[in-house]
Amino acid sequence: MENKELRKSYFQRIYQSYIPAYAFGGALIASVPRAFKRPYGGPFVPGCLLCGGFNAIGGLAIASGDLTNGSGICTAWSIAYLMINATKSIKSFRLYPIALTTFATANAVGYGKTFMNEY
């Protein structure tokens, strides 16, 4: 029982920090050169820049001490990424698009849970 509580508290603590937001934003912005080539199943350039940039802004809000608004921003833009790219990335069955979709799902769930607990 104690191990389950430890994992739960770790999951809650990691999504009360800005690290996942910066990591996902950085991964999306780093994938812009790849998005110019338009790989099958991969994200497109405006989606990378918008979702990555706003996740970084959400991380900045969390780093500034505004956990509620920062986690709300990260949740909204992670869900936006999923709405735009989830279906085609899963259908492509390629590693990089599926990894980004998994990262977006984890951020949406983690920061969404944090937002609901704070709000």
Swiss-Prot record:
Say which domain of life the source belongs to. Answer: Eukaryota
Task: Using the UniProt record, give the first listed, main subcellular location.
Answer: mitochondrion
The membrane-spanning stretches of this chain are: 13-32, 42-64, 69-86, 93-112
Q: How does it sit in the membrane?
A: Multi-pass membrane protein
Q: Where can this protein be found? A: Mitochondrion membrane
Q: Does the keyword Mitochondrion apply?
A: yes
Manganese found in the keyword field: no
| Pfam families per the UniProt record, alphabetical | Aim19 (PF10315)
Supply the InterPro entries for this chain: AIM19 (IPR019419)
Q: What keywords sit in the KW lines? A: Membrane, Mitochondrion, Transmembrane, Transmembrane helix
One GO BP annotation of this record: heme biosynthetic process
One GO cellular component, as annotated: mitochondrion
What family, per the record? Answer: Belongs to the AIM19 family.
What is the protein's name according to its record?
A: Altered inheritance of mitochondria protein 19 homolog
- Species of origin: Schizosaccharomyces pombe (strain 972 / ATCC 24843) (Fission yeast)
- Please name the taxonomic classification of the source: Eukaryota, Fungi, Dikarya, Ascomycota, Taphrinomycotina
